[in-house]
Amino acid sequence: GQGLATYRELIRNLSVKSKPEGGALTMVLDRWINSVQTAVAEGGISMDSSEFNKAVEERILSVVRQMQDLVHGFDFARLLTLYFRAFTDGDDELKGKVLKWFRGEYTTRTEAKQELGVTVIITDDDWYEYLKLFAYFFRQAGYQGLMVFFDELVNIYKIPNAISRQYNYEKILTM
């Protein structure tokens, strides 16, 4: 659980200039959807038009399709699409479930499948792949990228299991 715990902390403490204290994941996702909606409106499609939501969804899906070729990109893209639909439908419960998945809080695949229809969860084995997907997504969402700062990295050396300690050390070096 050390790698997944690291991932959870990184996502929980995600910050942007307008929300420097952390917890910015929802804001980033909502800002992305709002920016796509604004771009569609500036393209001449009225927000009152029946074509508006369709055009927004097409733009969102074009970003999502680009992610499907990345490792775990298909599931990540599916969850972004679910978040978008929950956003437009005002379904706060579904948004919360998608955010729970993005934060790595699902502990079983069964629970994720029942609540979201996805058969994959973020684990110790693949958390770094999801961090890379977030970095890619942030670029698509209009940010310059994702910068990761580790404070008190010495805590890795305090992990009692040598294999876990080495694995986490190697992941951080890879970053």
Language-model features: where?
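P-loop NTPase nucleotide-binding core
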Residues: G1-A141
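Conserved P-loop NTPase "ATPase switch" module shared by AAA+ and STAND
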Residues: G142-A162
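Substrate-gripping "pore-loop 1 plus following alpha2 helix"
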Residues: W127-L131, I163-M175
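Generic alpha-helix signal with a bias toward terminal, lower-confidence helices
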Residues: A41-G44, F150, A162-R165
